[in-house]
């Protein structure tokens, strides 16, 4: 304690203060008094010692095999430094990892995930320590799959992480997969890596997005893709117009098997290089129509095959080509026989042409139904009529709703003859009013059906096209209507009953005048790609835009889509020899500007076979843009 001098003690005690202090005390300073005063000067304050504390930064880290992580030790109350250890072993060892005097920790070459504790102890007082936890991630494993262009990348990330793979022809990579989250309880994650050229070496590495939003990079791996027989590959020639900028992404083709090519689905880059294929290896003459990328990263395909329905198959496959679900026409008939829904107790020939996956997980499919009819116009004898049914399958693929063309349309209207009466080739869902819109090629109509998410009565709300419910604006009726069309799709919101519809107008038997003259006999048929603005209240259809600057004739199939960049892409599937109805055994896919006149930005020629549909998709992974 301070001596009581009768005056406040000075804030700072110097040697001169100490002398003056001694003069004011009644007795001379004793050794003890001097020691206490000197203690005050030195800051010991009666023998109290400064507390030592050690902390390490970062508190946790993720490291790969042999990767170096630098830790920093902060010591308060001492300047003598620290000694480093790993799992209690001074400087560590090859099993747990090593750490040098500067805090540089080198992870061990672990074959499985493990953890290590890095510690720093004060040299002055070894009981004062700080520690950090290191999660050591074993290198990923890359393996081949049944698809020679797809690798399976497996790695075990920390809990709460997500895994994506970046890959490319060198270590700058360039492409990435989507993110796959780690299992909640921990465990390995496998990602199928697709989008690589045939017979090429690629580099790839996993990117782990950790729970704290930091990232960890796996080591680089090399993978070499395989080859396919040259005779099985499509003949493709892709060209970008000089100065043109096509919509980025990849091209998804579903091909009609011709000759030796049995590949049902093909994905290419915009240079025409094949990046992914699927061979269904189905017997008979099954062909894909169509193939669509699902939100889970799988492809859903519909195959139209033999008329007995055995080879009419729907398949869901992953990128490696493994079938995860399938349903044959025969299995659909079994489900229909057991279904309690109204009208479901029928027999169908098989699924065909299109399907729609609904937001609630239901699947809408098109199937054929045959009936023998009598007394039809132009057919004095009984005749088999092939109509269509639209079937709603729930999440378990059980039929819960059915619509039949026989219940709603006039059998005496058969523009393209019999038995193929309706030939429905498109079904889409209208989310704004919960209706279904279908395209009937052989009626040259697009129909809207009261579906109401499975509660509708199936009433035909309107018929769009020649002899339908709408009047044509900005065009001449009947020749500017669409005929034998494909791939009708909504390209704008429909909340007010006014929306735009895009389709591919094949143009078969186009009616040229009021007397019913059709193309083909004298006037060549032409295909078009119109955008129609529909007003459901006034029942008007206004031609907003049409591509017919370079007339060509596709006598069957085809597709048309509005791209993200505003351009329009369409597939002239069944091209014919110019000026004739003779098939040319080729298809042309074009991306054009949405201008008048349209300008071609990009095109692909498919030689020796046909592309039933062609779609530009962002990548092989939902939500990822390449």
Q: Which sequence ranges carry the predicted segments?
A:
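Histidine-/acidic-rich catalytic cores in large beta-rich domains
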Residues: 207-213, 220-626
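Extracellular/luminal low-complexity segments enriched in Ser/Thr/Pro
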Residues: 100-113, 192
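Short, well-ordered beta-strand segments
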Residues: 79-92, 131
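Surface-exposed loops/turns
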Residues: 65, 101, 112, 198-199
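Bacterial Sec-dependent N-terminal signal peptides
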Residues: 32, 38-57, 131-133, 137-141
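Hydrophobic beta-strand segments within extracellular beta-sandwich modules
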Residues: 116-118, 204
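Short, surface-exposed linear motifs at loops/turns and structural transition points
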Residues: 138-228
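Short, exposed coil/turn segments at beta-strand boundaries within extracellular/luminal domains
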Residues: 123-131, 212-217
């Amino acid at each position: 304690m301070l001596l009581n001098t009768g005056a406040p003690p000075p804030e700072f005690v110097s040697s001169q203060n100490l002398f003056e202090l001694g003069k004011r005390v009644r007795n001379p300073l004793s050794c003890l008094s001097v020691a206490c005063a000197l203690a005050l000067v030195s800051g010991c304050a009666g023998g109290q010692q400064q507390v030592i504390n050690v902390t390490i930064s970062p508190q946790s880290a993720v490291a790969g095999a042999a990767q170096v992580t630098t830790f920093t030790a902060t010591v308060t109350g001492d300047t003598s430094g620290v000694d480093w250890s790993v799992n209690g072993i001074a400087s560590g060892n090859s099993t747990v990892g090593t750490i040098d005097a500067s805090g540089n920790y080198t992870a061990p070459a672990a074959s499985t995930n493990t953890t290590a504790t890095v510690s720093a102890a004060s040299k002055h007082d070894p009981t004062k320590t700080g520690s950090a936890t290191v999660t050591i991630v074993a290198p990923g494993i890359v393996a081949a799959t049944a698809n020679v262009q797809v690798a399976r990348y497996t790695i075990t990330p920390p809990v709460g992480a997500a895994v994506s793979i970046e890959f490319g022809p060198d270590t700058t990579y360039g492409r990435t997969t989507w993110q796959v989250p780690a299992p909640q309880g921990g465990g390995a994650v496998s990602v199928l890596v697709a989008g690589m050229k045939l017979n090429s070496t690629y580099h790839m590495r996993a990117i782990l997005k950790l729970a704290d939003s930091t990232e960890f990079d796996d080591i680089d791996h090399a993978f070499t893709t395989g080859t396919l027989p040259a005779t099985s590959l499509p003949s493709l020639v892709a060209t970008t117009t000089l100065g043109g900028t096509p919509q980025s992404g990849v091209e998804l083709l579903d091909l009609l098997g011709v000759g030796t090519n049995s590949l049902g689905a093909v994905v290419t880059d915009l240079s025409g290089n094949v990046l992914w294929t699927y061979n269904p290896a189905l017997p008979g003459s099954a062909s894909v129509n169509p193939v669509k990328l699902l939100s889970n990263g799988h492809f859903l395909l519909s195959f139209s095959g033999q008329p007995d329905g055995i080879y009419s198959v729907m398949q869901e496959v992953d990128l490696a080509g493994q079938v995860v679900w399938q349903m044959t026409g025969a299995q659909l008939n079994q489900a229909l026989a057991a279904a309690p829904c109204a009208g479901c107790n029928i027999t169908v020939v098989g699924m065909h042409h299109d399907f729609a996956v609904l937001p609630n997980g239901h699947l809408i499919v098109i199937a054929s139904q045959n009936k023998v009819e009598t007394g039809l116009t132009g057919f004095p004898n009984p005749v088999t009529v092939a109509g269509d049914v639209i079937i709603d399958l729930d999440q378990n693929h059980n039929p819960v709703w059915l619509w039949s063309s026989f219940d709603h349309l006039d059998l005496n209207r058969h523009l393209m003859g019999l038995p193929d009466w309706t030939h429905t080739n498109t079904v889409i869902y209208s989310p704004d009013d919960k209706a279904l819109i279908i395209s009937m090629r052989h009626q040259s109509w697009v129909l809207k059906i009261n579906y109401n998410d499975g509660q509708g009565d199936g009433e035909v709300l309107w018929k769009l096209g020649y002899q339908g419910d709408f009047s044509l604006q900005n065009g001449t009726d009947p020749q500017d209507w669409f005929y034998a069309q494909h791939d009708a799709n909504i390209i704008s919101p429909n909340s007010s009953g006014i929306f735009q519809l895009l389709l591919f107008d094949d143009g078969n038997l186009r009616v040229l005048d009021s007397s019913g003259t059709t193309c083909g006999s004298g006037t060549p048929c032409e295909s078009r790609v119109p955008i129609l603005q529909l007003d459901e209240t006034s029942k008007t259809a206004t031609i907003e835009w049409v591509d017919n600057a370079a007339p060509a004739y596709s006598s069957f199939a085809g597709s048309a889509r509005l791209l993200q960049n505003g351009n329009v892409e369409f597939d002239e599937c069944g091209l014919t020899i110019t000026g004739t109805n003779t098939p040319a055994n080729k298809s042309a896919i074009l991306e054009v500007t949405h201008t008048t006149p349209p300008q071609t930005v990009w095109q692909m020629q498919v030689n020796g076979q046909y592309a039933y549909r062609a779609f530009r998709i962002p990548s092989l992974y939902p939500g990822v843009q390449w």
